[in-house]
Amino acid sequence: MKNHMKKILVIGETCVDKFIYCNVNRLSPEAPVPVLIPIRTTSNPGMAGNTSANVTVLSPKSVILGLNQEEDITKIRYVEEKSNHMFFRVDEGETNTLPFRWTAEVDVMLGEADITIVSDYNKGFLSNADLKEIAYKSKLSILDSKRRLTNDVIEDFSFVKLNELERINNPELINDNIITTLGSRGAEYKNTIYPSPKPQETIDVSGAGDTFTASFIIKYHQLKDERVAIKFANRMAAEVV
């Protein structure tokens, strides 16, 4: 008998994360702004694309499925080389995102997926109704969303991952399976703090939240232990900051 090959479905907006690293040694004589001299440029998948990249590393023997928007989105960050301080970001291509389309194939993918990860960056691709339907049809699911959420939207998700600011902005949520990431302090789940193994303050432009989400749900699927999965996700997220 062949071993079952795990299927992981990642749904959400993708982008290209471009980082332009610069030397910054002086102010402009024309205005009180720094002069940035580009040194090097790197590009990698961002948003749900970063989540998929993490899944590929964490579970290399799995089948990775993706449902993403058709339009190209690029986030260009100008970063000071020595300090890793980001001066500003330029976003391109996110103004005309077409909405998610339900098809028979989508239903099949949801039915076959062992894990469904929703990386919702609130760019117009997914609606509240889409989120509810995805959660209802998924076996094991986690939502990482940047929108204002309601209890009826999240009630059927196995887990919901929010950062600290997102949790503050959603005070009415009562789902017991909300995990709140706390940056350098780790994560909170059911009123218990799980400290980060690297508690120092950092400037994060690396998508550590996507890493946490993917790491947590994959480890939870393996062991069915929230505490162990959160500790593992904390370690993985700390490595990319």
What are the roles of these predicted feature ranges?
Residues 1-5:
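A short acidic-Thr-Gly-centered motif at the start of a beta-strand
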Residues 25-27, 31, 78-96, 115-172, ...:
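Conserved beta-alpha-beta core of the PfkB/ribokinase-like small-molecule kinase fold
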Residues 13-14, 121, 211:
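Active-site metal-binding loops of divalent metal-dependent hydrolases
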Residues 62-63, 158-164, 194-196:
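Short hydrophobic/aromatic-enriched beta-strand-loop microsegments
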Residues 14-16, 68-71, 94, 147, ...:
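Glycine-rich beta-alpha junction loops
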Residues 6-11, 16-117, 128-130:
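Conserved N-terminal subdomain of the carbohydrate kinase-like
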Residues 11, 65-67, 144, 163, ...:
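Generic beta-sheet signal
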Residues 112, 129-140, 145-156, 169-241:
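Conserved phosphate-binding/catalytic region of the ribokinase-like
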